[in-house]
C-alpha cells in the first residue's frame, strides 16, 4: 500500500512539474501575440483580427487543459485524513465563486452538511467542480437554481450500496435546474474528456467530473449522476465519515 501511495505521489509531482513547464511557453506565446496585435493593430484586416482572437482562444483552451490534467493527477494522489467541516468548505467555495454566481444570477441553497475526515484540498476541489458544473450547464434564459442537501445513510441504503454496516456514511445531493443529460450517459460523463454538449456553447476541459470521481474514489465513497434533459441534474455523493 505504501508503494502505491509513493507511486501516485510521484506521478502527481511529475505532472505538476510538467504543467509548470508547459505554462511557460504558453505565457510567452500569449505575450507575443498581444505585442504583435497592439503594435500592428491598425494594419490588421478584419480577418487577421479574427485569427488573433482564435489564437488567444486556443491558448486559453490549452491552459485550461493543462490545469485540468494537473488537478486530475492531484486527485489521484493519496487522500490525507483531517477533520473537514463540509459547511465551511462549501461556503469558502461559494465565496471564491461569488462573481460568477452574481454574473449568472444563480441561487444556491445549502442545507446543514456533515463533518468528515479526508483531504481538505480535494474536498474543496470536489465541490468547486460540482458547483461550476451546475452553474455552467444551464439554459441561458433561466437563472441557475442549485440546492445542496445531506442526510445520514440508513441500514437499507448501506445494504443496497454494499457498504460496511458498522461504518457511518452520509449522502450529499447537488441538484440543479440546468440542461440535464440523457440518463444513458450517466456513467460516461465521469470519463476524462467526455463532453455531452458542444464545446462552442459550454467551455471547459472535459475533466471536471472525472476529477470528482477520482476524489470520491480516493475517499472510498461513491458518486453517481441522474439527469433529465432540459430539466436538470442531480449528483449524489456517498461519503464515509472516515476513510
What are these regions (language model features)?
Residues 82-95, 147-150:
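A conserved beta-strand-to-alpha-helix junction within the catalytic ATP-binding
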Residues 143-155:
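Short beta-strand/loop element within the Bergerat-fold HATPase_c
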Residues 220-226:
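Glycine-rich ATP-binding loops of the HATPase_c
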Residues 168-172, 181-193:
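Short conserved segment of the HATPase_c
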Residues 14, 39, 43, 51, ...:
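Flexible helix-coil linker/loop segments in the cytosolic histidine kinase module
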Residues 57-62:
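Short alpha-helical segment of the dimerization/phosphotransfer core of two-component systems
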Residues 208, 212:
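Short alpha-helical Gxxx[C/S/T] motif in the catalytic ATP-binding
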Amino acid at each position: 500500500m505504501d508503494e502505491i501511495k509513493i507511486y501516485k505521489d510521484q506521478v502527481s509531482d511529475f505532472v505538476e512539474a510538467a504543467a509548470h513547464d508547459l505554462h511557460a511557453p504558453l505565457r510567452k506565446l500569449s505575450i507575443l501575440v498581444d505585442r504583435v496585435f497592439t503594435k500592428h493593430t491598425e494594419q490588421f484586416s478584419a480577418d487577421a483580427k479574427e485569427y488573433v482572437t482564435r489564437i488567444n482562444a486556443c491558448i486559453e483552451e490549452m491552459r485550461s487543459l493543462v490545469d485540468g490534467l494537473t488537478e486530475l493527477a492531484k486527485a489521484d494522489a493519496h487522500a490525507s485524513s483531517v477533520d473537514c467541516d463540509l459547511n465551511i468548505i462549501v461556503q469558502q467555495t461559494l465565496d471564491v465563486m461569488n462573481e460568477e454566481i452574481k454574473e449568472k444570477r444563480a441561487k444556491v441553497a445549502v442545507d446543514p452538511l456533515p463533518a468528515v475526515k479526508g483531504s481538505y484540498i480535494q474536498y474543496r476541489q470536489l465541490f468547486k467542480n460540482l458547483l461550476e458544473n451546475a452553474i455552467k450547464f444551464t439554459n441561458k434564459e433561466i437563472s441557475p437554481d442549485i440546492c445542496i442537501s445531506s442526510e445520514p445513510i440508513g441500514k437499507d441504503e448501506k445494504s443496497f450500496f454494499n457498504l460496511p454496516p458498522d461504518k457511518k456514511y452520509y449522502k450529499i445531493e447537488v441538484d440543479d435546474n440546468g440542461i440535464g443529460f440523457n440518463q444513458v450517459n450517466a456513467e460516461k460523463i465521469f470519463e476524462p474528456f467526455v463532453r455531452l454538449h458542444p464545446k462552442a456553447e459550454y467551455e471547459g476541459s472535459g475533466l471536471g467530473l472525472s476529477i470528482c470521481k477520482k476524489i470520491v474514489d480516493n475517499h472510498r465513497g461513491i458518486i453517481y449522476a441522474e439527469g433529465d434533459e432540459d430539466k436538470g441534474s442531480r449528483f449524489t455523493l456517498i461519503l464515509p465519515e472516515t476513510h
